[in-house]
């Protein structure tokens, strides 16, 4: 598991715990979108999970460069990325009721709450 952090670590305990679980932790603060996309591609991930999506600090320009074959939107914001490069969104019925599923640009994968 590789993680890329674009916002700069504030030394939070949670961040440190997650970093210990990863094989690779990429500190991308100050990197351009193209540089970060290249760093991700070098690691050849099968799936890239975007936890920021539309929130502050999101890496939309990097995601738009499709640095992994499959990109998944999850957790950061209960909304669609609106982009064509994000393939799936992990959602539950509280975030996206089935009758509203067409508002997402991604294919939806429903998970249990």
Residue ranges of predicted features:
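A charged, well-structured terminal subsegment
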Residues: 101-113
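Conserved nucleotide-cofactor-binding alpha/beta core module
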Residues: 1-86, 93-101
């Amino acid at each position: 598991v590789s993680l890329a952090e674009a916002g700069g670590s504030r030394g939070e305990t949670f961040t440190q715990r997650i970093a210990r679980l990863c094989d690779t932790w990429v500190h991308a603060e100050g990197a351009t979108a193209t540089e970060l996309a290249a760093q991700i591609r070098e690691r050849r991930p099968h799936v890239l999970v975007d936890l920021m999506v539309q929130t502050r600090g999101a890496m939309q320009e990097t995601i738009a460069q499709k640095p992994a074959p499959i990109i998944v939107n999850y957790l950061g914001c209960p909304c669609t990325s609106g982009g064509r490069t994000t393939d799936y969104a992990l959602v539950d019925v509280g975030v996206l009721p089935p009758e509203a599923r067409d508002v997402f640009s991604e294919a939806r994968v429903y998970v249990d709450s």
